[in-house]
């Protein structure tokens, strides 16, 4: 399993870091088999696999359930798990208690926290030994305020984001995720920090990239953001299911090939 020192080395040597967002045992097993550097158990699971309207509906128990499944599927991969909405922003002590619970109960390698406002919690977690990945730019838990759109598009907002990035690093974040910001800004932030920066919709100038398993494979997702590239097409699964349905109706399945050959009723009748 890669450790933080490996990700720091990769940043300094210019080797890009791959991160995949996955939510369950089989996707985690596939990610590990593909030698992905890191897995993120994101609260985006709310919309992607639970059918919620937004990440706001995701609970701490949801995150625990899915993170445990990912950990079982990827025992030798660095796993990061999201702190869900409602667990950050209460007060530093309560927030930290939630962080301890999630970190302890999932056996993740790190937790991820959205927003620069969480800097005090990041520091508390750092002080007690919980690695924290910070998340700036488009922060889905705040979509009601920021919207799902490109962030930091004004000079003032860009300057603020640079300051926020420096703040979370100073507070003890081990890594930073930048989402949906101009690529030149992401590059400047990446170069200004000593910690690795992972981008999603932030251009090529970051230290690595993250995409969601379901987006990569076109698996059950309806919306395709600009920054998503499809590397496979699981949408053909609908046709496969339809074929199964049709064969059942036509009594074309199961054939002898898929039927156990042992006969038992003669013995029962004796």
UniProtKB/Swiss-Prot annotation:
Record-linked InterPro entries: Pantoate_hydroxy_MeTrfase (IPR003700), Pyrv/PenolPyrv_kinase-like_dom (IPR015813), Pyrv_kinase-like_dom_sf (IPR040442)
* Localization, UniProt: Cytoplasm
Q: How is the cofactor bound?
A: Binds 1 Mg(2+) ion per subunit.
Record's CDD domains? Answer: KPHMT-like
The Gene Ontology biological process annotation of the record reads: pantothenate biosynthetic process
Enzymatic class: transferase
> What's the catalysed reaction?
3-methyl-2-oxobutanoate + (6R)-5,10-methylene-5,6,7,8-tetrahydrofolate + H2O = 2-dehydropantoate + (6S)-5,6,7,8-tetrahydrofolate
Give the protein name, as stated in the record: 3-methyl-2-oxobutanoate hydroxymethyltransferase
- Quote the catalytic residue positions: 179 (proton acceptor)
Instruction: Supply the source organism for this entry.
Output: Oceanobacillus iheyensis (strain DSM 14371 / CIP 107618 / JCM 11309 / KCTC 3954 / HTE831)
Q: Which EC number(s) does the record attach to this protein?
A: 2.1.2.11
The task this protein performs is described as:
Catalyzes the reversible reaction in which hydroxymethyl group from 5,10-methylenetetrahydrofolate is transferred onto alpha-ketoisovalerate to form ketopantoate.
The subunit field of the Swiss-Prot or TrEMBL record says:
Homodecamer; pentamer of dimers.
